[in-house]
C-alpha cells in the first residue's frame, strides 16, 4: 500500500497489475488448475462501497469522533490446498428402496465433511446419502496395498510397483483443514458416477422403453448427456421423471451396478485407470474399483449378488513423481476489507465492519462455506489484534507458555 501511494496508484489496482492470472506458472513452474479468479476478487473489492467511499467515510467519521483515527484496510491471498499425495476410499451403495449408504476414510474434525460428502451424492444420484459412516480404516471390498514414499520414490520405483493392480502410492490421507471439499468429494462422486452410469441409467432406459413399440422413449433420442435430476426425479429429453426408488428397484432387478468402492490418488492431478465393466472398458479418475451388482446378476459370471468384486485395472496412469517438484496446482483466493477506528490516546483498535469475498469453487453447502469464512475471520482478528508473542528466549517456544500467558480471543472480541 505504501508503494502504491508513492506510485499514485489505487492499492488494489497495483495488486491487479501483479496478480497471478489463469495460465500463468507459479514460482516453481506449475500451471494452476482451471480458472484462477483472484483478479475477479480484487475487482469486486475495488467496487465495494467500503472501498469506493473510504475517503469520504474517513472525513465524516473523524469529524464526528475526535481523538480517533479511521481507515480501511484490504488484503487478498491465494492459498493452495492439498499435499501432493492425497488419497481416500469411498463406498456408495443403493438399496432396492432407494436409500443411499456412504462409507469413507475421511474423518469429521469440524470441517463439515460428514455433511458435504452426503450432499456430494446428489449430483449423480439425485438425493443425499442418509446412512453414513466415516473414519473407516478396513476396506475388505477393495484390498489395496502401498509401499515406498509417495514424495521421495523414484519414477522407476513407481513404474515397477504400479504393475501390481492392487498397489497405490498412498492409501488414505489424514483429515486436515478443508480438504474434504475437493479431495474427499472426488472419490465419493466417482463412486456415484459409476452407479449412475452402469446401474441407474440402464434402469431408466428400461423403464422409459417399456411398453408397446418401445414405450415413451421410442419417438425421441434419449442420451445420457441429456440426463438431469429435477425435484428429485430423473429425466432426459422430455422423458417422464423417475424417482430414485423406482430406478433402484429396477437396477437391482436387472443386475446393474448398485454399489461401488473407489480409491483415488492425487499428486496435483488425479491418477486414472482403465477398468473392464461388463462389455466395456471405462477410464476413471481412480486407481481402484470394486462393484456390487443387483440380485438379477446372481447367476451370471459378472458378479455375485450382495457381494463386491474388485475390478482388476487394465492400465493405470499415475502422475509422474516429478509433479511434486513443480509445486501446487490447486488454489483458492480470498479478499477482505476491514473498517477500523483507532483511539489515538491509548491505541485501542475497534473493528467497525468487514467484508470478505472468497472463490470456493462449486458450493456444496452455503452454511458450511459461511462457517469457514466466519471462522477464518475470527482467527484473523485474534491473531492481528490480540496475539502477542515476544521474540527470543522469553517467547512461546521456551516451554512455559500456556493460556495463562497467551490471550485467547473471546467471542465478544472477534464477533
Task: Give short role names for the model-derived ranges.
Residues 71-96, 104, 330:
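Conserved beta-alpha junction segments in alpha/beta enzyme cores
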Residues 92-101, 361-364, 373:
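Short, hydrophobic/aliphatic alpha-helical segments
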Residues 99-104, 351-353:
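Short, aliphatic-rich beta-strand segments
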Residues 1-68, 75, 79, 120-415:
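C-terminal catalytic domains of large/alpha subunits in multi-subunit enzymes
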Residues 107:
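Glycine-rich NAD(P) Rossmann-fold beta1-alpha1 loop
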